[in-house]
Curated annotation (Swiss-Prot):
It comes from Chelonoidis carbonarius (Red-footed tortoise). The keyword Cell membrane does not apply. This is Hemoglobin subunit beta. The gene is HBB. Transmembrane segments: none annotated. Heme b binds at H64, H93.
Length: 147
């Protein structure tokens, strides 16, 4: 179980309240696919992923990014029980989708970058530390289904 200070919780929840899930989620997933092109193999059904421009404007990428970030929002709502919150998603990604758990860390790092660019004033070093702790906790929870 991850232990959160009141300050960490405040950094996370106050910034999350400002996040446009559709915009930030789409951008984060698109960046993941551009920066780490080997992750595209999990999204072969999404159509044209042939260039950064194609990825950034791919409706399926943007929609799935929103879905991913909506799920991430469950971590924000359940900071004290992230493992349980992501148990089913962990099983899905492990047993059915066979996603390398390292990709969860990569996406978390990308999310940090996207949040920092969207909220430069709010994304102080202390806020970054709290968000880094959160994305690492989510990545760990999603990787628990791997044996």
């Amino acid at each position: 179980m991850v232990h959160w200070s009141c300050e960490e919780k405040q950094f996370i929840t106050s910034l999350w309240a400002k996040v446009n899930v559709e915009e930030v989620g789409g951008e984060a997933l698109a960046r993941l696919l551009i920066v780490y092109p080997w992750t595209q193999r999990f999204f072969s059904s999404f159509g044209n992923l042939s260039s950064p421009n194609a990825i950034l404007h791919n409706a399926k990428v943007l929609a799935h990014g929103k879905k991913v970030l909506t799920s991430f929002g469950e971590a924000v709502k359940n900071l004290d029980n992230i493992k349980k919150t992501f148990a089913q998603l962990s099983e899905l990604h492990c047993e059915k989708l066979h996603v390398d758990p390292e990709n969860f860390k990569l996406l978390g790092n990308i999310l940090i970058i996207v949040l920092a660019t969207h909220f430069p004033k709010e994304f102080t070093p202390a806020s970054q530390a709290a968000w880094t702790k959160l994305v690492n906790a989510v990545a760990h929870a999603l990787a628990l289904g791997y044996h």
